[in-house]
């Protein structure tokens, strides 16, 4: 099966990483390998690309894409939060560029048959790594109403979380909810028509986002990554992180800011006693957004936010 995907902000990522021949880079979320192809071209002939993805479809696609370049490429079917262990297995102490693209691929939405989208008729699964056990159907059919409310509000910032959770619990009492289209219709029916008409997005968007985040423990994995990545970035090396919703972007922004700050002593201390030094410097003050031209060509890019920083 062809892996269908269009990389987001390819020029901005290429310029942000600013890779040179002979360097080592990591693409933490290969997806369709679009960014990875550009990165490998920049570090050849003697450089190295390390590609990671938890989706087996993306891994199989990467092996096809890089079939003639495996002397310079290492591919791992794993989660990006395990970057320290992956680099250790290769005997690599530091890299010159890291890319983390947190978005879903078009392939996952349209051809994955895993219920990521509220369109079509697919199993309510939402696992990115099919080796894991928990599915979205498990959450929807087994969690107490209060727990569903918490997930929808915390991970989807859904204001109608109580009404939606109540509707789900009422519906599943008759029969389990097992298809994406079933859940999408339950959510749509639970929200007052006036609010539905006012929304610019599908009424089930935030609920599906929240379930996907919960199933894949996305924010936990991101937190683990943000705590450790700087330890493996060579001086002068760059990191690019593309996020697609405010929860992720706030986490990235806070971590970059903390690493830029260095000293954590109270402001009224006459001198630093903590010993922390700045370890990172943001390349741009604000997140980079896709151009209107790119959004017209690739509507999935509309909510993307790119943050770039370099290792001091």
Curated annotation (Swiss-Prot):
Protein name, as recorded: Ribosomal RNA small subunit methyltransferase H
GO MF entry, a single one: rRNA (cytosine-N4-)-methyltransferase activity
UniProt keyword annotations, A-Z: Cytoplasm, Methyltransferase, rRNA processing, S-adenosyl-L-methionine, Transferase
Family assignment from sequence similarity: Belongs to the methyltransferase superfamily. RsmH family.
NCBIfam families cross-referenced by the UniProt entry: 16S rRNA (cytosine(1402)-N(4))-methyltransferase RsmH
Biological source species: Desulforapulum autotrophicum (strain ATCC 43914 / DSM 3382 / VKM B-1955 / HRM2) (Desulfobacterium autotrophicum)
Gene Ontology cellular-component annotations: cytoplasm
InterPro entries the record matches: RsmH, SAM-dep_MeTrfase_MraW_recog, SAM-dependent_MTases_sf
